[in-house]
Each structure stands twice: as structure tokens, then as C-alpha cells.
Amino acid sequence: LADYEHTRALLLVGSHPRHDAPLLGNRIRRAWKHGAEIHAVNPLAFDHHFSLNNQLIGDPAQQIADLAAVAAALAQLRSVTFSAEINEWAARSTQQTQAQAIARSLHQQEPSRVLFGDHAVRHPSASLLRRIARFIAEASGSAFDEMPHGANGAAAWRVGCVPQRGPGGSATAIGSNALDAVRKSRRAYVLYGAEAPEDFADGAAAAAALGQADFVLAFAAFAHPTLETSANVILPIGLAPEVDGSYVNVDGTLQAIAAGAKMPGDARAGWRVLRALGAALGLGGFEFDDFATLHANVRPLLGGGTLDATAEQPSPVPIAGGEGLLVQRYLPIYRVDGVVRRAPALQSTVLGESGELRLHPEDALALGIGQAGDVAVGGVRFACVASPEVPRGVCRVASGFASTAALPVTGARIQIERVKNG
């Protein structure tokens, strides 16, 4: 993290450090104050607290093309070859001049870095974007960094809480990801601190899958309408500030936390509930009675293996053609989990949102709503505002709201109609 202060050139790929990782954002701002050249390939024109030398924003397909154009420019500078697939994407970019400027900056400035951010991880073709970003880093001699997805994402990868790897990077049979698990309905689900539809990429599919399941077990800290109608058993657990625990930060450093509040009612620390359930089922690995023993058992798993993802399989490119606006999902900073969603003080700030749709001003004008108005998508009414952060041809849809859950995921197209009042 400290190395960012000394960076001379930085490419942000799907990253808004000011919101995604404020401490990292502060380091980048310091580097900018000392003359660092900062560039971005992003889905939206984010409100950064530093200036950008070059900014390429576009719909999900354009993001791939623009990043590929940077890769193509670097390949030409370094006289190296790269895949025909990336070359084909590069030819689709309409921002060739800026892409070449970014390539020259990364090539000439030392040290340089490529930061693969949270919005890139959420892209429908994240693995393709990652492959291109890694090529850019390798061709330019830049460091490559990827932001962990979620507050404890790095620890989850280390201990194997992902479908494609075991503890410490050990090989394992590839299981279903969360999207497949809800789109291809299962007979039973176990939810741990997750709320549907708000916490899922395809919230509508998640809520429907839970409603159709034969059995749903939920570990939850809050009452929720979906759980009340779909869960067969709800086990109350404490929130993170109410229990002892630990996190692994972006530098891989283990950070322990102590409980700072008392759990209400019958709630118990989640690890205690899991231990009791594991013991009742006769499973191995649950022979611990306190957090210190649990922590000692898990800690060795955090230091082994590698998080290298260069061998990953490319994902398809599910970006819809046809008419209508392309959806760009966006998770507002105060909609990321059940705690902040239930905090009135946070929701009343300037960063609090109400689930309105956002369009580029020219698209809003063409629709006839001016700066703000009501629109309909599939017969459902939404507030809509014009915003210069949104690229042309894109509809920014806020995630984390039950009201927007029925709208499609990033890369799909929607038809929007103006609602005439009165």
C-alpha cells in the first residue's frame, strides 16, 4: 500500500479508490500531488479527489475495447505479440489517441502500476479484462494489483472460501459460483449474512430461487422480508462489531478486532453457531471451544500458496446487442451491506441514494425528461435523473435496492419510456 505514494504512473481499471478503498485513495492522491500521471478505464466518470491525465469511460463492451487499445499500443511500443482476440477488441476502440498516451506513460514512467478494481471484478467479462490488464502490466514493466472483493476477500481466497480453490491455493474440483447457484435452482440453500435480493448480482433470481427451494437455512443478524417468507430456519448471529474476529487487508496483513458491543437477544457469534452445527452433524474440524483456538487453526492457512490467477479460464462476453440502453450496475457506498443500508444517518448524506436510474444528459434529453423525471421499464416506474458521469448509451442502475432488483444485470439492454405526469 505504501508503494503507491511513490508511483509515477498509475492505470486504474474499473476502480474508484475514493469509495472502494479510502486509505488507498489517499495514497494515490499523495502520489498525484507529487506529479504522478494517473489514467483510468472506467464504467463511469467517478468523482475522484485527484486529476486524471486520461480517462476512458464507456459501456461494458467499450471498456474491453479501450483497455485492449492500451494493450495494443504497448505491444507496438515494445514490439511484442499478443492474442488476436485482444487485437480484435482494440480495433473497436474509439479512443485510440488517449490509449496510446496511457501506453506511453506506463512505458516511460518508473515505477508504474496497474490497479484492477472492484468495478472491474464486477464486469460481466472480468476474466477477459483481467487478462488484458495483466498483459499491460507485464508489457510495461508495471506492478499489477487487484483489489480484494469485499472487506475480507483476501482472507476468503487464502483459506479456500471460493468455488475453484482450496486452502492456500490447493487444487480442488470447481464448484458453482453464486450466480449459477441461484440461476440454476437448488433444493436447499444456506445463507450466511446475505440478504436477497440486495446482496446478489442477480437479485431477482436469488429471491426466486430461495422462494422455490425445499429448505433454506439462514444465519442472520437482521429480520428481512425474504427470510421471513422463504427461510425454514433462521439462526441469529452477531454483527462484525459485536464479535471477536480478524481481517486480512490488501497488504496481506492479519488484523484482529475485539467485540465492541453486546449482541442483542439470542444472537451468538457466528463461529459459535457454526461450531455447534458442525459438531451436531459429526463433521471434522470443529474441535474448538474459543476464538483463540479457532484463530490458531486458521492462521497457518493464510500464509501459504499464491493468489496468482494467470491460469484462469477466459469468461464469455455476455454483452447484449440490439436496441435500448446498456445496463451498468453500480453499488453505492452506503448500500454494500445490511448494516449501512439500515443506517438513517448514512442514507441522509449526499452519498445516500434512493434507487433512481441515471442517464447521460443527451440520452435523458432524447427521452424527453430533461434533468429529471419518471420513466417506466417493463411497466415498472422509476425516478430518473441526468448525470454527466454516465457514458452515452448507458443506464446506470444502483444495486443494493429491492426496488431495482428486477432490472437486468450489467451488459443487458433495457427499453426505457418516459412517464407523462398528469
Regions found by a protein language model. Give the residues of each.
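Iron-sulfur-cluster electron-transfer modules
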Residues: L1-G25, R29, Q55-D59, A65, ...
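Long, well-ordered, tryptophan-enriched scaffold segments
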Residues: Y4, W32-G117
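A cross-kingdom feature strongest in bacterial/archaeal respiratory oxidoreductases
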Residues: H6-L12, R18-D47, L115, R130, ...
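Conserved active-site and cofactor/substrate-binding residues in soluble primary-metabolism enzymes
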Residues: L23, A61-A65, T94-T97, A101, ...
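Short alpha-helices
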Residues: P43, F50-S83, A126-L129, F135, ...
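Acidic/glycine-enriched edge-of-secondary-structure segments
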Residues: A72-Q96, A151-A173, K262
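A glycine-rich, hydrophobic/aromatic-adjacent loop/helix-cap motif
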Residues: H107-A181, Q328
